[in-house]
Amino acid sequence: MKLIFDIQLFAHKKAGGSTRNGRDSESKRLGVKRSDGQFVLAGNILVRQRGTKFHPGKNVGRGGDDTLFALVTGYVKFENKRGRKVVSVIPAEEMVAVQ
């Protein structure tokens, strides 16, 4: 008695499991938005930041997310005071008087 087996082998690859990677958060576009000596209008954003890397000086407000913004129209001034980076806005009228 003769037995004949017809065995066919096919290419096979077991499906891989799902991965938990493959996503990233959108950038928050933080940083300095206006440079030293630049003319700004009241309400312009000067610095977007997390925490207080820059501190508000004269005529600069701080938002709930630590964003610094101009309270008056004038010129931006960055300076170091007691080891802190401070951002101020010098009103346009004062700059005209100085020149």
From Swiss-Prot:
Gene3D superfamilies: 2.40.50.100. The N-terminus is cleaved by ribosomal processing cysteine protease Prp. This is Large ribosomal subunit protein bL27. GO terms for molecular function: structural constituent of ribosome. GO terms for cellular component: cytosolic large ribosomal subunit. Transmembrane segments: none annotated. GO terms for biological process: translation. Residues 1-10 form a propeptide.
